[in-house]
A protein has these predicted regions:
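A short, aromatic/hydrophobic, helix- or strand-capping loop or linear motif
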Residues: 80-84, 151, 229-234
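Conserved polymerase palm-domain catalytic core
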Residues: 23, 30, 99-200, 204-221, ...
Length: 325
Protein backbone atom coordinates (compact mmCIF):
# COMPACT_ATOMS: atom_id res chain seq x y z
CA UNK A 1 0.00 0.00 0.00
CA UNK A 2 2.80 2.42 0.85
CA UNK A 3 4.62 1.79 -2.43
CA UNK A 4 1.66 2.67 -4.65
CA UNK A 5 0.74 5.79 -2.68
CA UNK A 6 0.76 8.81 -4.98
CA UNK A 7 1.46 6.80 -8.16
CA UNK A 8 -1.73 4.75 -8.54
CA UNK A 9 -2.72 6.96 -11.48
CA UNK A 10 0.15 5.52 -13.56
CA UNK A 11 -0.86 2.76 -16.03
CA UNK A 12 2.03 0.50 -14.97
CA UNK A 13 1.01 0.82 -11.31
CA UNK A 14 -2.63 0.06 -12.15
CA UNK A 15 -1.56 -3.06 -14.06
CA UNK A 16 0.60 -4.26 -11.16
CA UNK A 17 -2.19 -3.56 -8.68
CA UNK A 18 -4.76 -5.53 -10.69
CA UNK A 19 -2.39 -8.50 -10.94
CA UNK A 20 -0.78 -8.09 -7.53
CA UNK A 21 -0.85 -11.77 -6.49
CA UNK A 22 0.79 -12.99 -9.69
CA UNK A 23 3.31 -10.14 -9.74
CA UNK A 24 4.40 -10.65 -6.13
CA UNK A 25 4.61 -14.42 -6.63
CA UNK A 26 6.85 -13.85 -9.65
CA UNK A 27 9.08 -11.54 -7.56
CA UNK A 28 9.38 -14.15 -4.80
CA UNK A 29 10.34 -16.85 -7.30
CA UNK A 30 13.11 -14.70 -8.75
CA UNK A 31 14.46 -13.84 -5.30
CA UNK A 32 14.44 -17.48 -4.18
CA UNK A 33 16.14 -18.72 -7.35
CA UNK A 34 18.68 -15.89 -7.42
CA UNK A 35 17.49 -14.55 -10.78
CA UNK A 36 16.23 -11.20 -9.49
CA UNK A 37 17.70 -8.18 -11.25
CA UNK A 38 17.21 -4.59 -10.21
CA UNK A 39 15.50 -2.49 -12.87
CA UNK A 40 17.18 0.54 -14.39
CA UNK A 41 15.81 3.84 -13.01
CA UNK A 42 14.46 6.57 -15.24
CA UNK A 43 15.88 10.09 -14.78
CA UNK A 44 13.33 12.81 -14.02
CA UNK A 45 13.40 16.53 -13.20
CA UNK A 46 11.95 17.80 -9.92
CA UNK A 47 10.82 21.41 -10.18
CA UNK A 48 9.58 22.23 -6.64
CA UNK A 49 10.76 23.66 -4.28
CA UNK A 50 13.86 23.99 -6.46
CA UNK A 51 14.90 22.37 -9.71
CA UNK A 52 16.99 19.23 -9.28
CA UNK A 53 17.48 15.82 -10.84
CA UNK A 54 15.72 12.74 -9.54
CA UNK A 55 15.10 9.09 -10.35
CA UNK A 56 11.90 7.15 -10.99
CA UNK A 57 11.90 3.38 -10.43
CA UNK A 58 9.41 0.66 -11.34
CA UNK A 59 6.86 -0.40 -8.74
CA UNK A 60 8.35 -3.89 -8.35
CA UNK A 61 11.73 -2.35 -7.54
CA UNK A 62 10.10 0.03 -5.10
CA UNK A 63 8.42 -2.88 -3.30
CA UNK A 64 11.68 -4.83 -3.14
CA UNK A 65 13.64 -1.85 -1.82
CA UNK A 66 10.94 -0.89 0.66
CA UNK A 67 10.99 -4.40 2.09
CA UNK A 68 14.74 -4.18 2.69
CA UNK A 69 14.54 -0.64 4.07
CA UNK A 70 11.63 -1.17 6.47
CA UNK A 71 12.48 -4.67 7.68
CA UNK A 72 16.27 -4.65 7.90
CA UNK A 73 18.17 -1.50 6.94
CA UNK A 74 16.33 1.17 8.93
CA UNK A 75 15.79 -0.91 12.13
CA UNK A 76 19.45 -1.97 12.14
CA UNK A 77 21.04 1.39 11.48
CA UNK A 78 18.71 3.65 13.49
CA UNK A 79 19.41 2.02 16.85
CA UNK A 80 22.44 4.23 17.41
CA UNK A 81 20.76 7.53 16.47
CA UNK A 82 20.64 10.32 19.03
CA UNK A 83 17.23 11.81 19.79
CA UNK A 84 18.19 15.10 18.11
CA UNK A 85 18.79 13.44 14.74
CA UNK A 86 15.33 14.44 13.56
CA UNK A 87 14.82 13.84 9.82
CA UNK A 88 12.97 11.04 7.99
CA UNK A 89 12.31 8.68 10.90
CA UNK A 90 9.30 7.03 12.51
CA UNK A 91 7.87 9.36 15.14
CA UNK A 92 10.13 12.18 14.02
CA UNK A 93 10.19 14.74 11.22
CA UNK A 94 10.07 18.47 10.73
CA UNK A 95 7.49 19.10 13.48
CA UNK A 96 9.53 17.02 15.92
CA UNK A 97 12.66 19.00 15.01
CA UNK A 98 10.87 22.29 15.68
CA UNK A 99 9.68 21.07 19.08
CA UNK A 100 13.18 19.91 20.01
CA UNK A 101 14.64 23.25 18.94
CA UNK A 102 12.14 25.14 21.10
CA UNK A 103 13.02 22.87 24.03
CA UNK A 104 16.74 23.55 23.56
CA UNK A 105 16.10 27.30 23.34
CA UNK A 106 13.99 27.25 26.50
CA UNK A 107 16.53 25.20 28.46
CA UNK A 108 19.32 27.54 27.37
CA UNK A 109 17.26 30.60 28.35
CA UNK A 110 16.52 29.15 31.80
CA UNK A 111 20.26 28.96 32.52
CA UNK A 112 21.75 31.84 30.53
CA UNK A 113 18.89 34.14 29.55
CA UNK A 114 19.47 35.86 26.20
CA UNK A 115 23.22 35.60 26.66
CA UNK A 116 24.34 33.26 23.92
CA UNK A 117 24.69 32.57 20.21
CA UNK A 118 23.34 30.09 17.69
CA UNK A 119 25.68 28.27 15.31
CA UNK A 120 24.01 27.12 12.09
CA UNK A 121 26.03 24.71 9.96
CA UNK A 122 24.99 23.89 6.41
CA UNK A 123 26.85 21.27 4.38
CA UNK A 124 27.65 22.18 0.79
CA UNK A 125 25.90 19.89 -1.69
CA UNK A 126 25.14 17.17 0.82
CA UNK A 127 23.68 14.55 -1.51
CA UNK A 128 25.62 15.49 -4.69
CA UNK A 129 28.91 15.25 -2.75
CA UNK A 130 28.07 12.10 -0.80
CA UNK A 131 30.83 9.53 -1.30
CA UNK A 132 29.62 6.05 -2.21
CA UNK A 133 32.40 4.33 -0.28
CA UNK A 134 31.51 6.28 2.89
CA UNK A 135 27.86 5.23 2.65
CA UNK A 136 28.73 1.59 2.01
CA UNK A 137 31.20 1.58 4.89
CA UNK A 138 28.47 2.91 7.16
CA UNK A 139 25.99 0.24 6.03
CA UNK A 140 28.64 -2.49 6.32
CA UNK A 141 28.88 -1.92 10.08
CA UNK A 142 25.22 -2.81 10.64
CA UNK A 143 24.23 -5.35 7.96
CA UNK A 144 24.99 -9.03 7.42
CA UNK A 145 26.65 -10.15 4.19
CA UNK A 146 23.52 -11.01 2.19
CA UNK A 147 21.63 -7.81 3.01
CA UNK A 148 24.73 -5.69 2.50
CA UNK A 149 25.24 -7.22 -0.96
CA UNK A 150 21.58 -6.58 -1.87
CA UNK A 151 21.85 -2.94 -0.74
CA UNK A 152 25.08 -2.40 -2.69
CA UNK A 153 23.52 -3.95 -5.82
CA UNK A 154 20.62 -1.51 -5.61
CA UNK A 155 22.84 1.53 -5.10
CA UNK A 156 25.27 0.51 -7.85
CA UNK A 157 22.40 -0.04 -10.30
CA UNK A 158 20.83 3.34 -9.62
CA UNK A 159 23.93 5.51 -9.18
CA UNK A 160 27.06 5.29 -11.30
CA UNK A 161 30.42 6.78 -10.35
CA UNK A 162 31.93 7.21 -6.92
CA UNK A 163 30.26 10.39 -5.66
CA UNK A 164 26.70 11.71 -5.55
CA UNK A 165 23.16 10.50 -4.89
CA UNK A 166 19.69 11.83 -5.68
CA UNK A 167 17.66 12.33 -2.48
CA UNK A 168 14.38 10.83 -3.76
CA UNK A 169 15.15 7.20 -2.87
CA UNK A 170 14.18 5.95 0.60
CA UNK A 171 17.47 4.06 0.81
CA UNK A 172 19.43 7.23 0.05
CA UNK A 173 17.42 9.11 2.68
CA UNK A 174 18.47 6.48 5.21
CA UNK A 175 22.05 7.03 4.08
CA UNK A 176 21.55 10.77 4.57
CA UNK A 177 20.34 10.50 8.16
CA UNK A 178 22.92 7.87 9.14
CA UNK A 179 26.13 9.11 7.50
CA UNK A 180 26.56 11.90 10.07
CA UNK A 181 25.63 9.72 13.04
CA UNK A 182 29.28 9.57 14.10
CA UNK A 183 29.41 13.37 14.02
CA UNK A 184 26.31 13.54 16.22
CA UNK A 185 27.92 11.31 18.84
CA UNK A 186 31.23 13.15 18.57
CA UNK A 187 29.56 16.50 19.27
CA UNK A 188 27.40 15.20 22.10
CA UNK A 189 29.88 12.86 23.80
CA UNK A 190 33.37 14.17 22.99
CA UNK A 191 32.74 17.90 22.64
CA UNK A 192 30.01 17.78 25.32
CA UNK A 193 27.63 19.97 23.29
CA UNK A 194 24.41 20.11 25.27
CA UNK A 195 22.16 21.98 22.84
CA UNK A 196 22.71 20.24 19.50
CA UNK A 197 20.19 19.45 16.76
CA UNK A 198 20.48 18.04 13.25
CA UNK A 199 17.86 17.84 10.53
CA UNK A 200 19.58 15.94 7.69
CA UNK A 201 22.49 18.29 6.83
CA UNK A 202 21.28 21.36 8.76
CA UNK A 203 22.97 21.52 12.16
CA UNK A 204 22.12 23.83 15.07
CA UNK A 205 24.31 24.40 18.15
CA UNK A 206 23.37 26.80 20.96
CA UNK A 207 25.99 28.01 23.45
CA UNK A 208 26.59 30.99 25.72
CA UNK A 209 30.22 31.40 24.54
CA UNK A 210 30.82 32.51 20.94
CA UNK A 211 34.46 31.40 21.02
CA UNK A 212 33.35 27.93 22.04
CA UNK A 213 31.02 27.83 19.03
CA UNK A 214 33.96 28.74 16.78
CA UNK A 215 35.92 25.85 18.26
CA UNK A 216 32.98 23.49 17.74
CA UNK A 217 32.65 24.67 14.13
CA UNK A 218 36.33 23.91 13.52
CA UNK A 219 35.90 20.40 14.92
CA UNK A 220 32.80 19.82 12.79
CA UNK A 221 34.69 20.94 9.67
CA UNK A 222 37.53 18.52 10.43
CA UNK A 223 35.09 15.64 10.83
CA UNK A 224 33.26 16.51 7.61
CA UNK A 225 36.49 16.68 5.62
CA UNK A 226 37.26 13.07 6.54
CA UNK A 227 34.15 11.89 4.68
CA UNK A 228 34.45 14.26 1.73
CA UNK A 229 32.22 17.17 2.78
CA UNK A 230 32.77 20.88 3.29
CA UNK A 231 30.56 23.51 4.88
CA UNK A 232 28.56 26.05 2.91
CA UNK A 233 30.23 29.25 4.08
CA UNK A 234 27.36 31.42 2.80
CA UNK A 235 24.76 29.64 4.94
CA UNK A 236 26.94 28.72 7.92
CA UNK A 237 26.81 31.50 10.52
CA UNK A 238 26.86 32.40 14.22
CA UNK A 239 23.96 34.63 15.28
CA UNK A 240 23.31 36.33 18.64
CA UNK A 241 20.37 34.64 20.31
CA UNK A 242 18.68 38.00 20.89
CA UNK A 243 18.48 38.73 17.14
CA UNK A 244 16.66 35.58 16.08
CA UNK A 245 17.48 33.13 13.30
CA UNK A 246 15.78 31.16 10.53
CA UNK A 247 15.52 27.37 10.65
CA UNK A 248 13.24 24.93 8.80
CA UNK A 249 11.11 27.68 7.29
CA UNK A 250 10.44 29.66 10.48
CA UNK A 251 12.15 32.60 12.15
CA UNK A 252 12.81 31.85 15.84
CA UNK A 253 13.00 34.67 18.38
CA UNK A 254 13.38 34.50 22.16
CA UNK A 255 11.80 37.38 24.06
CA UNK A 256 13.16 38.95 27.24
CA UNK A 257 10.66 36.88 29.24
CA UNK A 258 11.73 33.62 27.61
CA UNK A 259 8.79 33.22 25.25
CA UNK A 260 9.83 31.55 22.00
CA UNK A 261 8.19 33.02 18.91
CA UNK A 262 7.96 31.18 15.59
CA UNK A 263 7.02 33.23 12.54
CA UNK A 264 7.17 32.40 8.85
CA UNK A 265 10.03 34.01 6.99
CA UNK A 266 9.22 36.68 4.42
CA UNK A 267 10.31 34.54 1.46
CA UNK A 268 7.68 31.93 2.33
CA UNK A 269 4.94 34.56 2.53
CA UNK A 270 5.94 36.15 -0.78
CA UNK A 271 6.04 32.74 -2.44
CA UNK A 272 2.58 31.85 -1.11
CA UNK A 273 1.04 35.07 -2.45
CA UNK A 274 2.37 34.33 -5.94
CA UNK A 275 1.22 30.72 -5.69
CA UNK A 276 -2.30 31.79 -4.73
CA UNK A 277 -2.42 34.13 -7.70
CA UNK A 278 -1.53 31.26 -10.04
CA UNK A 279 -4.02 28.86 -8.42
CA UNK A 280 -6.91 31.31 -8.66
CA UNK A 281 -6.04 32.11 -12.28
CA UNK A 282 -6.00 28.39 -13.14
CA UNK A 283 -9.33 27.86 -11.35
CA UNK A 284 -10.97 30.77 -13.17
CA UNK A 285 -9.73 29.32 -16.48
CA UNK A 286 -11.27 25.97 -15.58
CA UNK A 287 -7.95 24.11 -15.48
CA UNK A 288 -8.37 23.16 -11.81
CA UNK A 289 -11.35 23.24 -9.46
CA UNK A 290 -11.87 25.83 -6.74
CA UNK A 291 -11.85 22.96 -4.24
CA UNK A 292 -8.31 22.08 -5.34
CA UNK A 293 -7.16 25.68 -4.86
CA UNK A 294 -8.85 25.80 -1.44
CA UNK A 295 -7.13 22.57 -0.45
CA UNK A 296 -3.69 24.00 -1.30
CA UNK A 297 -4.43 27.17 0.66
CA UNK A 298 -5.65 25.25 3.71
CA UNK A 299 -2.47 23.18 3.62
CA UNK A 300 -0.37 26.35 3.79
CA UNK A 301 -2.53 27.71 6.63
CA UNK A 302 -2.03 24.47 8.58
CA UNK A 303 1.74 24.83 8.29
CA UNK A 304 1.69 28.54 9.15
CA UNK A 305 -0.54 27.77 12.14
CA UNK A 306 2.26 25.79 13.76
CA UNK A 307 3.91 29.11 14.56
CA UNK A 308 2.74 32.44 15.96
CA UNK A 309 0.90 33.36 12.78
CA UNK A 310 -2.70 34.18 13.73
CA UNK A 311 -2.67 37.70 12.27
CA UNK A 312 -0.66 36.61 9.23
CA UNK A 313 -3.14 33.84 8.39
CA UNK A 314 -6.00 36.33 8.69
CA UNK A 315 -4.26 38.76 6.30
CA UNK A 316 -3.47 36.06 3.74
CA UNK A 317 -7.03 34.70 4.01
CA UNK A 318 -8.41 38.15 3.21
CA UNK A 319 -5.95 38.41 0.32
CA UNK A 320 -7.01 34.99 -1.00
CA UNK A 321 -10.71 35.85 -0.81
CA UNK A 322 -10.09 39.14 -2.65
CA UNK A 323 -8.51 37.22 -5.53
CA UNK A 324 -11.83 35.50 -6.23
CA UNK A 325 -13.74 38.77 -6.56
Amino acid sequence: MKCKRGVLWKPATKHFNLNAVEEVHRMVEKLETGTWKNGQPRPISILYPKKRDGLSIMLKDRIYQRSINDNVLYPSISRSFIIDNCACQKGKGIDFARKRLKKHLWNHYCKHGLNGHVLQVDIKGYYPNMRHDAVKAKFRRYLNDSVYKAVCDILDTQYVGEVGYNPGSQMVQIAGISLLDDLDHYCKERLHVKHYLRYMDDIIVIHDDRNELLRILTEIEKHLEKIGFSINKEKTCITPLSKGFTYLGFVYRVTSTGKILMTLNSANIKHERKKLQRLVALAKDGKITKEKADECFKSWCANAGKGNSYKLIKRITDYYNDLWR
